[in-house]
Regions:
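Class I S-adenosyl-L-methionine-dependent methyltransferase catalytic core
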Residues: 1-134
Length: 134
């Protein structure tokens, strides 16, 4: 799938309207999501792969991976309300290969082929990004 088509499809994702700023939850714009996923796809990191989406929010990156042929995706987020939006988005796209899990990234175990994420940047909460990069 080409980047522009993916971007257009991802525009259909419902936004998460109640971000918790202390968790540094920010939406990933569709242009950025499509760009990141296109690069990962071209490098062979999506199609047929098992993917973890850390801090998945509304699920835009997970859904993009599913649309690009990922085998199995697990979206993790500490915020149950964000996961409800992610579930609605996967239902909207009739995607059934994504599992949504309420969990801190510190508690994730297991193996995958590819990790995608839009982590906190530690702007409001110093070192909030550490759990995502260690």
């Amino acid at each position: 799938m080409d980047k522009k088509k993916l971007e257009i499809l991802l525009e259909g994702c419902l936004p998460y309207k109640e971000p918790m700023f202390h968790l540094e939850q920010y939406s990933t714009p569709t242009t950025i999501a499509a760009g990141i996923l296109n690069i990962a796809y071209l490098k062979g990191d999506i199609e047929g792969k098992k993917i973890y989406d850390l801090g998945c929010g509304n699920g835009i990156l997970s859904i993009g991976c599913a649309l690009m042929g990922a085998d199995k995706i697990t979206g993790y987020d500490i915020d149950g309300n964000a996961l409800e939006v992610a579930k609605k988005n996967s239902e909207k796209f009739c995607i059934d290969n994504i599992t949504w899990v309420k969990s801190s990234v510190k508690n994730i175990r297991g193996k995958c082929d590819t990790v995608i994420q839009n982590p906190p940047f530690g702007v409001r909460n110093a070192k909030a990004d550490r759990a995502f990069i260690t």
